[in-house]
Curated annotation (Swiss-Prot):
Function: Cleaves the N-terminal amino acid of tripeptides.
Gene3D superfamilies: 3.30.70.360, Zn peptidases
Protein name: Peptidase T
Disulfide partners: none
UniProtKB keywords: Aminopeptidase, Cytoplasm, Hydrolase, Metal-binding, Metalloprotease, Protease, Zinc
Entry's EC annotation: 3.4.11.4
Higher taxonomy: Bacteria, Bacillati, Bacillota, Bacilli, Bacillales
Details of cofactor binding: Binds 2 Zn(2+) ions per subunit.
Domain of life: Bacteria
Major localization listed first in the record, in broad terms: cytoplasm
Coiled coil: none
Gene for this chain: pepT
């Protein structure tokens, strides 16, 4: 199993599948289509049935049931794309067997070193086989580790028919990293009662709470005149943007929050005297607090409009996704089965809120409750990203055990 994980994963990460937020195609990049087509062929080779790839790049397949019991159809999902935060082109994975727990020089020429001082969790992987970057790209373990684990688990179940299971559906989705993963996902065609995304991090991760999320785009309109004769005439749009930001509580930003604390995050600010544009994301686990945060944004805008004129500030604000907990709680048994599966494999479940979103956040509100499970990756979205093959193997075992337990308990 370990060699299959290494072979598949190192091959998959070499395919550039970064999504592109500026693209309006689906998927947003051709690399995702190329990767999807490859996976279609490999799913067929493994022995899965009903293997499809639709016009939007969504890959689906079926592991047929090998039991006469009436077992709920479950699904496992991962995403095809990698993050846009750092380059994902020409990924050169480096395999470190029997890792000694010390610093790894990823790139001597560029002096890129993965150190325990910067990443304190690193020594805990002593003795593992870990895969790193060469210091010039991200790795793409998010989410090619999860995707690999699903492929290997399905292959194992096909070749070990003594493990009884119901019908299992598999899906690989595009554009998750830019929040569009579920946009064209056909829940009805997928046909599962519930699913799990394999899109987590370190060993034991089990997540079924996510942020409530909104995005706010603010346009500040100024009046530009010659600065020498600007008195009582000029209105500086960039200063309006600064004034707006000054009304938000300083301590309620990502760099000051953790756990269940929400925040306002200024993602970008661009402009000049004539016009400036700011983009914020608003996040909170509690729905009432989430609505209160949006009200705060709206109230600041109203105050500034009263002060400077209606056209001085224009707000566009949209909800992006909601806390999946609301949809998971009524079917809590899907979390319990994953929890029990981990415990039976001597894995200590680490239940914590996702300070972000997964495809599962949106899919849960589309009628497919979908918690998230660990994959073994660390330091996602950058050159210090790595994955433990030993933990990937544990994730495969969890997938197999979940499928087995659903059949056993049917």
């Amino acid at each position: 199993m370990k060699q299959e994980l290494i072979e598949r994963f190192t091959r998959y990460v070499k395919i550039d599948t970064q999504s592109n937020e500026d693209s309006h195609t689906v998927p947003t990049t051709p690399g995702q289509i190329e990767f999807g087509k490859l996976l279609v062929e490999e799913l067929k080779e493994v022995g899965l049935t009903e293997v499809t790839m639709d016009d939007n790049g969504y890959v689906m397949a079926t592991l047929p049931a090998n039991t006469d019991k009436d077992v709920p159809v479950i699904g496992f999902l991962a995403h095809l794309d990698t993050a846009t935060d750092f380059t994902g082109k020409n990924v050169k994975p480096q395999i470190h067997e029997n890792f000694d727990g010390n610093a790894i020089t990823l790139n001597e020429e560029l002096n890129v070193v993965l150190t325990p001082e910067q990443f304190p969790e690193l020594p805990s992987y002593k003795g593992h086989t870990i895969i790193t970057t060469d210091g010039t790209t991200l790795l793409g373990a998010d989410d090619k580790a999860g995707l690999t684990e699903i492929m290997v688990a399905m292959n194992y179940l096909i070749h070990n028919p003594q493990i009884k299971h119901g019908k299992v559906r598999v899906a690989f989705t595009p554009d998750e990293e830019i929040g569009r993963g579920p946009a064209h996902f056909d829940v009805e065609a997928f046909g599962a009662s519930f699913a799990y995304t394999m899109d987590g991090g370190p060993l034991g991760g089990l997540e079924y709470e996510s942020f409530n999320a909104a995005g706010a785009k603010l346009t500040f309109n100024g009046t530009n005149t010659h600065p020498g004769t600007a008195k009582n005439k000029m209105r500086n749009a960039t200063k309006l943007a600064m004034e707006f930001n000054g009304h938000l509580p300083v301590e309620e930003a990502p760099e000051y929050t953790e756990g269940y604390e929400g925040f306002y995050h200024l993602l970008s600010l661009n402009g000049d005297v004539e016009q400036s544009k700011a983009y914020y994301i608003i996040r909170d686990f509690d729905r009432k607090n989430f609505e209160a945060r949006k009200n705060t944004i709206e109230n600041i805008v109203k105050q500034m409009q009263e002060k400077y004129g209606q056209d001085a500030v224009v707000l566009e604000m949209n909800d992006q996704y909601y806390n999946m907990l609301e949809k998971i709680e009524p079917v809590r048994e899907i979390v319990d089965i994953a929890y029990e599966a981990m415990k039976s494999l001597n894995i200590e479940p680490n239940i914590h809120p996702i300070r972000g979103g997964t495809d599962g956040s949106q899919l849960s509100y589309m009628g497919l409750p979908t918690p998230n499970i660990f994959t073994g990756g660390e330091n996602y979205h950058g050159k210090f990203e790595y994955v433990s093959v030993d933990v990937m193997e544990k994730a495969v075992q969890v997938i197999i055990e979940i499928a087995r337990r659903f059949e056993e308990q049917a």
